[in-house]
Amino acid sequence: MTLLESVQSPADVKRLEHGELAKLAAEIRSFLIEKVSRTGGHLGPNLGAIELTLAVHRVFDSPRDAVVFDTGHQAYVHKIVTGRQSGFDRLRKRDGISGYPSRAESEHDLVENSHASTALSYADGLARAFQLGSEQRHVVAVVGDGALTGGMCWEALNNIAADPDRPVVIVVNDNGRSYAPTIGGLAEHLAGLRLKPGYERALESGRRTLQNLPVVGRSLYTGLHAAKSGIKDALSPQVMFSDLGIKYLGPVDGHDLRSMEQALSMAKAFGGPVIVHAVTRKGNGFAPAENDVAEQMHQVKVIDPETGIPTKPAPKIWTDVYSDELVRIGAEREDVVAITAAMLGPTGLDKFAAAYPERCYDVGIAEQHAMTSAAGMAMGGLHPVFAVYSTFLNRAFDQLLMDVALHRQPVTVTLDRSGITGDDGASHNGMWDLSILGAIPGIQVAAPRDAVTLREELREAVAVDDGPTVMRFPKGSVIEEVPAVERIGGVDVLSKPASDERSEVLLAAVGAFGQLGVAVAERLAAQGIGVTVVDPRWVVPVPQAVLDLAARHSLVVTLEDCGRHGGFGWSLAAAMRDQEIDVPLRDLAVPNRFLQHASRDEVLSDLGLTEQDIARRITEWVAGRLTPVVVGNGRGETATGA
């Protein structure tokens, strides 16, 4: 049995001698490289958090002491030492463990935090609850991968600092990066701390000297530490934290277990809020990750565990098409600028940044700021393009509504990973964007179906100069073209019955579901059911051409890869009522529930959003049986639509 196999709980880690910990860390590093190479996942961040996480579990008592990770993707080692090693064979796959903390998996996971910058607010609330209940429990917030660039962290710090007795230990896992190198004034400040370790040595020397004094040593040290303002400016560059009233320890080598344990033990003994600044290296111990200058293997597909090279050639994806077209637009229009919230590569802006570095802005994990900054740029005569994952748009809704749309500013927002993303689970599905966007007056939203329409609709979006535009597209591979047979009022007709056949059903297939809609129509044609398939192209507001076509059919069906509530079908139904178009409408979309991690195809199959299931439902509806039909594989999740 390996040392790692003997570890099934934090108590097992506590029992190990210091000499055994280095061996355990090495075994965990090999385990992560082997397992994540086979499944894909967040490899770099977790290789950099091994010793830090082991130290947390040796000093604190999870689950009695609450351990919260921010960002949640750096919690793999936490999962390993809390009894979930066997689950890594199916990491981020159906019936396997989540890539983020999961309350369903373990009592050690309090928070399913896969959106960044939230841990300190959770920690503040948990600590308040422990204080109110007179419970002697600590909260440990492990904050890393650029999360401190998010505004929520500073709102939380302001509250945590207000109570000198609040039992919160904040471990800053400072690897200098989110996906790419962390940017901004805070990043520069932390870099300065990394370069000036003298304060830690001075503080530790003073602690040892004073605590060795009989009787009064500990009290004297505590008093001097609390009143050290006269000397701290001479010794420490971390005034920002100390002036908030939060004690600071560091920088500490985050890969030195003994140093990390000492720092965490001191923080625990202090009582009250303490920051432990741990300096780590993303991808530590795996040469391919350390040598990956761009992202240090932040997130990988299936790779060779020796070389780090993907085992399969990467297909052309939606992000690639978007990235290339934005560069071409940038060459034609000097007023077009690009904004990202700490995701330059993942959102495809890396090529734009390389071509026009002075016109590309990475604002850190700060979607709210990004949106309002974009409004300001538009007021100044620029046309900003804010590239963001669909799931992170939720954070900037108020800014899009009040700062962009209310002022009718020409800002284009491009939503990558819209619809079902699959393996990252409930928090990363982009199924809420149309529900959010449909409530904003004056906004226009496009949903391309292929590479050709993505290029076309992106250009149409940046041509709008009197209000905000949005373009949504999914994760994954993209086909070059789903051809249209004609365009009517800006709406593409993708297929229709032969001239001598009657079209009974209008099938409006949104975005990437265009190809699926055509396949459904072909299947129904073989059964004698005439179907016209249209791609609305611009889904908000509802195109008049779709309404005109709806009035000429016996049944309207909408098909979309987003939430039903507030989706295109929902909006089309309202518009049909407004225009007194008395034709039945059935909307096939994602039900209003959180969806667990699985592949995109598996999730769509569960929801009945497959060619066979959709055709069967339409057949039943045409036959007059308009009651709900349970489809899918019996897991209890089905697309709504009756």
UniProtKB/Swiss-Prot annotation:
It catalyses: D-glyceraldehyde 3-phosphate + pyruvate + H(+) = 1-deoxy-D-xylulose 5-phosphate + CO2. GO terms for molecular function: 1-deoxy-D-xylulose-5-phosphate synthase activity; magnesium ion binding; thiamine pyrophosphate binding. It comes from the Bacteria. GO terms for cellular component: cytosol. GO terms for biological process: 1-deoxy-D-xylulose 5-phosphate biosynthetic process; isopentenyl diphosphate biosynthetic process, methylerythritol 4-phosphate pathway; terpenoid biosynthetic process; thiamine biosynthetic process. Pathway: Metabolic intermediate biosynthesis; 1-deoxy-D-xylulose 5-phosphate biosynthesis; 1-deoxy-D-xylulose 5-phosphate from D-glyceraldehyde 3-phosphate and pyruvate: step 1/1. Its cofactor is Mg(2+); thiamine diphosphate. Thiamine diphosphate binds at H73, S114, H115, A116, G146, A147, N175, F286, E367. Binds 1 Mg(2+) ion per subunit. The keyword Nucleus does not apply. The keyword Repressor does not apply. It holds the Pfam family DXP_synthase_N. Keywords: Isoprene biosynthesis, Magnesium, Metal-binding, Thiamine biosynthesis, Thiamine pyrophosphate, Transferase. Belongs to the transketolase family. DXPS subfamily. Catalyzes the acyloin condensation reaction between C atoms 2 and 3 of pyruvate and glyceraldehyde 3-phosphate to yield 1-deoxy-D-xylulose-5-phosphate (DXP). This is 1-deoxy-D-xylulose-5-phosphate synthase. It comes from Saccharopolyspora erythraea (strain ATCC 11635 / DSM 40517 / JCM 4748 / NBRC 13426 / NCIMB 8594 / NRRL 2338). The gene is dxs.
